[in-house]
Amino acid sequence: MQAAEPEKVTSAAESTEISTDKEKKEKVANDGDNYKKFRFGGYGEMVASFKDYGINRFYGAPEGNPDKHRNTISIPRFVLALDYKFNSKWILGAEIEFESGGTGTAYELENTENGEYETEVEKGGEVAIEQFHITRLIVPQFNIRAGHVIVPVGLTNAHHEPINFFGTYRPEGETTILPSTWHENGLEFFGSFGKGYASFDYQAMIVAGLNANGFDRNTWIASGKQGIFEEDNFTSPGYVARLDYKGVPGLRIGASFYYCADAGSNSDKADTYSSTGKIPVRIYTADAQYRNKYVIARANMVYGNLGNSAKLSEANTKLSNKSPYSRITPIAKNVVSYAAEAGLNISAFFKGNKKVPVIYPFARYEYYNPQEKGEASQIMEKRCQASMWTAGLNWYALPNLVVKADYTTRQIGTNKVFGTGKYNSENEFSIGIAYIGWFVKK
């Protein structure tokens, strides 16, 4: 969540967007964030889905996921947020996230017992500290933050609050191949520079790097985010950079880069990848958004490169079956995800009529493949590739409360924008509600 209040939304105005950080850079650096000492708030989302496919497309029938009608209902996220100002320059920020009811486990690696894995059920792995940091505001151009921070790689991580995407669920491509929400322990430098048509925001970070134990076939590096143990390995840090251009009213263009020199050196056991060689990870992303009172349009792409993927795949098949990792291989050398969505504000065409609700019909296309390309010796799994169309409605009952409904069709292994292939399509209708806001401020 960010420091600035949501803009007012009327029947003829655009809905607000919640920006990426705990503090919106321009306003926080000038201490213009509308609270004097502390504030408490949060965001959450609830979703029900009605599906015509089974739970696993990889096993069983050769045509992929079996035809099976099933329904689900969940609370994907409930997040509580707190900001506290020690003074105008030192700020404590925190968010606690409850996922899917807040149950789970944490793991310990017992080095005194031959490196066996043990679980601690009481830790609750699905109740997580999403953010916990101290910020030192210096000047608008340069500020420092230390602690547990959001890693803004990709559009969804940078703008992950539920009113910042049209669908009932977060965009599937990015959340399949990248951790979401991605948060790590580390140090961040951020600020704004330029003016007028040459205005930019930037973020630069050094954070705990990815753990290659968690890399697998279906989600690439998404399960390599650290945090399942009581301490994170910092042997090979992750280096993050993000730049956002905001010089044109209504337009934001962003790009981010992630680099970890050797994710294998962050593994649970130091000798797991001793014969593999270094396992470097590089992730490149670009995204854009344009909005005015009539339309909101977004687009994004992700490209990832993993070194020594064949040797890594072989090593990960030998991980302990007591470990929390999937051990499903092969792990791809390259992955790709790209998407675009657009929504139209119907109320903007009824100027002056405040009785017209703020409704955005929208459409979205996504392509993603965690098995885009392997090394010469690897055979990629075609059923990992998905081409998706989603269409639906967003009704902004309040400026920061939205009711969503959408229909999604997912084509598997086709490498086409339209059309079906040899595998069954996966279709679902979903309805949900999401909110964000500050409940108390002083």
What does each model-found stretch correspond to?
Residues 58-64, 111-112, 163-171, 221-224, ...:
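Short glycine/proline- and charge-enriched loop/turn segments
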Residues 209-221:
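C-terminal ends of transmembrane alpha-helices
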Residues 180, 230-237, 276-280:
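Active-site glycine- and acidic-residue-rich loops that bind
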